Amino acid sequence: MDGTYNKNAYKCPPLTRANVHGWEILLPCDVSFIWEGGNTVPKVIKGGKKTYTTPQGQEYERDILMPSVIGTMSFTIGWAINTPPGFSVWMSAPPNSPVPGLYPMTAMVPGWWPDEVNMNYICTTPNKIVTMSEGEPFMYFQIADDSFLEEVEFDVVN
């Protein structure tokens, strides 16, 4: 939206609301990777791991990028997102922020899910290096009330 002429996209309340109706997770470092196409797993070129230091001075490494399955790259966040019963976490790429060469895999994670979550992207362009910068959002999530689905009724008129 910042890239639109005179930032005109901000004048559209539905667009603005979509962009602020949840939380973004930002990359802790620059990353780049490539998918060579076909039945191959993407290869990390830069930023696969990041070293952190605890307040006590201990260093540890954490994965940032993990090649997943054929043509899929996982961005790790390092933690689980648990919600109260009846709520789930809807997660996807940040709205209105496409990344050339990638397609986000949107997920709905139930509140009881015990494992850490990853943001997965399908690589769409073989032999194209995908680069994302430190501080760039790679995941967007919001809390969803599961109960409304039981009450929704559609009235479709042709």
Which residues make up each language-model segment?
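DUTPase catalytic domain/fold
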Residues: 1-158
